[in-house]
């Protein structure tokens, strides 16, 4: 994985007080820039990370979006449907558990 992706994920993990959305079911045709553009309608996007699989070269279909405020995150969560490239993506608030050391298996792979 690129060093910038590891650095971005590490920054998201260390910012426990920040409002972060976990996004899954991202279509393979979408890039981080499209994710950032979509979520900018809800507020200022501080960081957007979509990790890539180094073997396939494709992203893993999930990512994280960090907003400037909790209110902006709530605005995004209140939207009933999020569509990128014609595909409905799933958005939820990042669980504190994943940010405080108990890593998911995907996070463990990204941080190696």
UniProtKB/Swiss-Prot annotation:
InterPro entries: Nucleotide-bd_a/b_plait_sf, RBD_domain_sf, RRM_dom, SLIRP/GR-RBP-like, SLIRP_RRM. Keywords: Mitochondrion, Nucleus, Phosphoprotein, Repressor, RNA-binding, Transcription, Transcription regulation, Transit peptide. It is found in: Mitochondrion; Nucleus. Gene3D superfamilies: 3.30.70.330. SMART domains: RRM. The modification Phosphoserine is found at residues 15, 105. RNA-binding protein that acts as a nuclear receptor corepressor. Probably acts by binding the SRA RNA, and repressing the SRA-mediated nuclear receptor coactivation. Binds the STR7 loop of SRA RNA. Also able to repress glucocorticoid (GR), androgen (AR), thyroid (TR) and VDR-mediated transactivation. This is SRA stem-loop-interacting RNA-binding protein, mitochondrial.
